[in-house]
Amino acid sequence: MLYELNNLLHMHLFGYISVRAGLAFLLAFLLVLILMPKYLAWAISKNANQPISKYVAAHAGKSKTPTMGGAVFITATVISAFIVIDLENIYVWIGLFTLIGFGLVGFKDDIGKILSGDNLEGLTPRGKMGLQIVIALISTGLLIYSGFPTEFYVPFVKTPLFDMGYFAIPFWILMFLAVTNAVNLTDGLDGLATVPSIISLVSLGVIVYITGHAIISHYLLMPHIKGVGEVLVLTTALAGALMGFLWYNCYPAEIFMGDTGSLSIGGFLAYLAILGKSEVLLILIGFVFVMETLSVILQVGSYKLRKKRIFLMAPLHHHFELKEWAENKIIVRFWMIAFITNLLALITLKIR
């Protein structure tokens, strides 16, 4: 809306991506603050609460906490984006589809859990995976159709290692699946997934903006892809919406994001990494999500092979809970790890 107004009235201010990115952040933040109390009142009246696993006894007191808060910050993100973004940009539309598509998969899963009152209900693992693959396939297919380059880059190297061609499709689909489920596993404590998500969005947003900027990308010896910089506006809208969500999700949480939120965030983070040619760097940017996922993989593998557990419980944050760390201490320490690893990731951009 503002972008079109900029063209009609020849107002150069709204032509700058940085200005519209800042506005998107503020609009989304304020929208969540306005909408969330209304959603909370509705969720409490409908008993749309988070079912708690019987294996996490310390969380029994959270059984009355409403869930599906992700629906609110997705809504705020989309509204804010439509107000300030360039709607003629194909990468924006693919990003919106990715965000909403994975959010709808999570929404279907959340609804099943709420109606049954059992955290093990909802979508079956196979059904959930199938829907995620469909959304990922459409997103990657749209990228290929739009002519998006398929070269594979690694940190510290200024030229691509090779061109993936159509093999980019299965690789990117695996990325979508890995990141969405990693964020989902991390969302187990109040605000634990929210802040690392915000930090990761900021880092990837910076990378995508640089990738879309001819001068800065040339200076940093990074790949230049025309048009992707506009996605920064959508990225800051989601970051702002998550900041507003954190107002209610910080310890002690009044609302959980549910799979609606975690899957949408994970899908969008994977999309940003693809746009910024940062598929490998995402390991460092999303390090908190990576270590949570690895803890589950190692735990399951160790138990199947040796009949022994490595951790008291997986994902990793539950291990520290059982070691009697205070919940807010676990949360803040994970936030600190996310901040440090993202700082390291941004430093690597100049080392090529």
Swiss-Prot record:
GO biological process, one term: cell wall organization
Keyword Cell wall biogenesis/degradation: yes
Reaction(s) catalysed by this chain's protein: UDP-N-acetyl-alpha-D-muramoyl-L-alanyl-gamma-D-glutamyl-meso-2,6-diaminopimeloyl-D-alanyl-D-alanine + di-trans,octa-cis-undecaprenyl phosphate = di-trans,octa-cis-undecaprenyl diphospho-N-acetyl-alpha-D-muramoyl-L-alanyl-D-glutamyl-meso-2,6-diaminopimeloyl-D-alanyl-D-alanine + UMP
InterPro entries xref list: Glycosyl_transferase_4 (IPR000715), PNAcMuramoyl-5peptid_Trfase (IPR003524), PNAcMuramoyl-5peptid_Trfase_CS (IPR018480)
Domain of life: Bacteria
Pfam family, one: Glycos_transf_4
Signal peptide interval: none
UniProt KW keywords: Cell cycle, Cell division, Cell inner membrane, Cell membrane, Cell shape, Cell wall biogenesis/degradation, Magnesium, Membrane, Metal-binding, Peptidoglycan synthesis, Transferase, Transmembrane, Transmembrane helix
The EC number(s) this enzyme carries: 2.7.8.13
GO cellular component terms, semicolon-separated: plasma membrane
Predominant cellular place of this UniProt entry's protein: membrane
Its membrane topology: Multi-pass membrane protein
One of the record's GO molecular function terms: phospho-N-acetylmuramoyl-pentapeptide-transferase activity
UniProt-annotated location(s): Cell inner membrane
Pathway named in the protein's UniProt entry: Cell wall biogenesis; peptidoglycan biosynthesis
Family, similarity comment: Belongs to the glycosyltransferase 4 family. MraY subfamily.
Protein name: Phospho-N-acetylmuramoyl-pentapeptide-transferase
UniProt organism field: Sulfurovum sp. (strain NBC37-1)
